[in-house]
C-alpha cells in the first residue's frame, strides 16, 4: 500500500507559481496617458485584473459580470509581457459560441489598459498592496483587492 502511495505521489508534478506579489486580484484605479499627461480615474469602476500562475483574467464587472478576456504572460524582475489573448465565452458546452476564443483585435483589450495583442509593461511598483505598470503609452495604477 505504501509503495502505491509513494508511486502515485512521485508521478504527480505540483506546479507552483513564481509570480510573487503579482499574483492576486487587482483593481485598475487609474490610467495615465504618457504622451498627453491625461488621467482617467477608474476608482469607482469595477475593472479588474486577476493573476494566477501563467494567466491573467481581465474583466469589467460593470459591463459584463461573467465574461472578459484571458491573456498569457511572461515576467522578469522588471517587466511583464502579456500575449495570446482569448475571449472568455464561458464553457465549451454552450454551443458554437462557448469556450475561449482567440482574439485578433487589440481594441477589445483597450478598456483594461492593454493596447496591443502582445504588450510589454515595466514594473514601476509592485508590492503587496499596490502595482504600477507602464507600457509605451500608458501608466496603469492598481490596488490589491
Model-assigned labels for residue ranges:
Residues 12-27:
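N-terminal helix-cap/turn-to-beta initiation motif at the start of protein domains
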Residues 120-141:
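Short, exposed beta-strand-loop hairpins at the edges of beta-sheets
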Residues 23-25, 52-57, 126-132:
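Short, hydrophobic/aromatic-rich segments at coil-to-beta transitions
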Amino acid at each position: 500500500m505504501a509503495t502505491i502511495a509513494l508511486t502515485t505521489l512521485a508521478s504527480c508534478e505540483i506546479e507552483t507559481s513564481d509570480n510573487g506579489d503579482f499574483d492576486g486580484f487587482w483593481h485598475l484605479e487609474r490610467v495615465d496617458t504618457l504622451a498627453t499627461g491625461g488621467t482617467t480615474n477608474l476608482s469607482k469602476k469595477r475593472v479588474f485584473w486577476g493573476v494566477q500562475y501563467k494567466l491573467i483574467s481581465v474583466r469589467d464587472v460593470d459591463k459584463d459580470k461573467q465574461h472578459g478576456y484571458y491573456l498569457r504572460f511572461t515576467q522578469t524582475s522588471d517587466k511583464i509581457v502579456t500575449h495570446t489573448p482569448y475571449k472568455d465565452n464561458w464553457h465549451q458546452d454552450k454551443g458554437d459560441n462557448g469556450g475561449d476564443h482567440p482574439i485578433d483585435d487589440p481594441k477589445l483589450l483597450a478598456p483594461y489598459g492593454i493596447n496591443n495583442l502582445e504588450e510589454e509593461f515595466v514594473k514601476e511598483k509592485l508590492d503587496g498592496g499596490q502595482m504600477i505598470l507602464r507600457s509605451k503609452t500608458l501608466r496603469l495604477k492598481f490596488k490589491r483587492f
